[in-house]
Amino acid sequence: MIKKYSFVNHRIVLYLILGCVVVCGVWYSFDVRQAIDVGAVDLSLPQMSNNLLKEVAVGEGKTTNRLSRLPVDSTVPTVLPQSLAGSIAPPLPLDAYGHLARVSAVRDFFDYFLTAQNDLTPAALDEIVTHEIVKQLHGKSAQAEAQDVWTRYCAYFSQLVKLPDMGMVLGDKLDFVAVQRALDQRASLAVRTLGDWSEPFFGAEQQRQRYDLERLKIADDQALTDEQKKKRLVALEQKLPSKVQEERIKIQQQQDAVVKIIQLQKDEVTPDGIRLQVVGLLGPEVAYRVAEIRRQDEIWQEKYKHYAAQRAQRAQIEAQQLEPKEHDVQVENLRQRIFTKPGEALRAASLDQ
């Protein structure tokens, strides 16, 4: 019975997480950093510390070694690397006057190309980025602006790897002072290299990291009672911009929906019953999709019962005639005949174990 629910629950959880990101557009990641809420101040502190440490230690989470690890070579490729093949670069946004818009989407454009850092030399990467800038903005004032921002972004990376190791770990705990110093250094570096672009590029990340750090400090403060920690966490959250608070509420609703759906499935509520009970949390479209996933899982479960019955009958007949390897081949052939949709046979095999 546990296996029966674990697979469909996993699918629904993934669907809800993706829906949360797409529909809500949240910047605050759906991860263990949010495990510490105002009702559970003692949860996941080691994991939270590790996550924040990784982000700070690698430099804004995803950028430290992007350029520093590239081999020194001037070869420029004539085609896109495999990591970018078949994809399209994000558009560079413009404001109403034709200038490059000061928004985070500009960083997204450059980060798209930086995903191929391990496949390109610095010269090749620069050539590809420049080519795409010209392709999108040829003849516009934003062309030179985009090229200047790219140069600044590269300068940020080259200086980032030169920052000293701050020794942010003391034993098995974070050194909060060192982490704060590291965040301050990165913020200062961003301003020096990117100027006014530091805010649209790193503002949201820096705000989230500092917020996470303050939550960690509160959760780790042994002088505070659980009730005092809850109050301080509430006060800290109230300092967030209203938009961020709204997004956090949406994320919490998603988490509540996941818990509710898992319980409804354990109670063997029908797909339509699930849809009616979660539509208020998820909206009609997502609730319908969750119910459909449940409905398809019920169909699969019936198919698996039919398969298991046939497998058991054959096992009794063939037990005295086939070697173990031959028996396994027969079972695999039976799976392939009954489970025709992608992934079904593999799922059946996992339940056979």
UniProtKB/Swiss-Prot annotation:
GO molecular function ontology, one term from the record: unfolded protein binding
Membrane-spanning segments: 12-32
Keyword Lipid metabolism listed: yes
Gene Ontology CC: one annotated term: plasma membrane
Predominant place of localization: membrane
Membrane topology, as annotated: Single-pass membrane protein
Keyword annotations: Cell inner membrane, Cell membrane, Chaperone, Lipid degradation, Lipid metabolism, Membrane, Transmembrane, Transmembrane helix
Subcellular location: Cell inner membrane
Gene Ontology terms: biological process: lipid catabolic process; protein folding
UniProt cross-references to SUPFAM superfamilies, sorted A to Z: Lipase chaperone-like
Function field: May be involved in the folding of the extracellular lipase during its passage through the periplasm.
Family label: Belongs to the lipase chaperone family.
Name of the featured protein: Lipase chaperone
Lineage of the organism: Bacteria, Pseudomonadati, Pseudomonadota, Gammaproteobacteria, Lysobacterales
